[in-house]
Amino acid sequence: MAPLSIKGVLIHQEQVLLLLNERGEWDLPGGRPDPGEDHRGALKREVREEAGLEVEVGALLDEHLFEVLPERFVKIVAYGCLLVGASAATPSYEHLETRWVPLDELGETIAGHRLPAGYLGAIRQAISQPRAPSDRDV
């Protein structure tokens, strides 16, 4: 059975939060639940640890297998997230960079780095869902 990683799609002011990992790929914030921790609790903790942000976890967006390395798979479970508080993200030691990427700049590569197809699919799923009125530009 593949290990589990809970990921969050955090969209704020028509931008999505991405993290650049050590493999040079864009990543969604998230990670493995601690023993006894549910998906939502794990995701809130991971976003806080990886980006210094507080979130509320929303709807399940996607589940898929991701081939991290040849023949090494991780089960990804992605949820929509809503930012609570400030939007200034700070990268942890686990990532090289955090970036709020404008939704109209999303693609298979961003700034010369690959965005895995499963993550792009989860982001597109989140975009298609209604967001909080306070998150829309006026």
Annotated model-derived regions:
Residues 26, 93-138:
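Nudix hydrolase/Nudix homology domain
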Residues 21-24:
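C-terminal lobe/hinge of AMP-binding adenylation domains
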Residues 65-88, 99, 103, 122, ...:
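Active-site-adjacent beta-strand/loop module that shapes the phosphate/pyrophosphate-binding cleft
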Residues 17, 34, 107:
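Nucleotide phosphate-binding site architecture
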Residues 1-3, 11, 71-74, 93:
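A generic fold-level signal
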Residues 1-16, 32, 63:
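Conserved N-terminal beta-strand and adjoining loop/helix that marks the start
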Residues 28-61:
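The catalytic Nudix box helix
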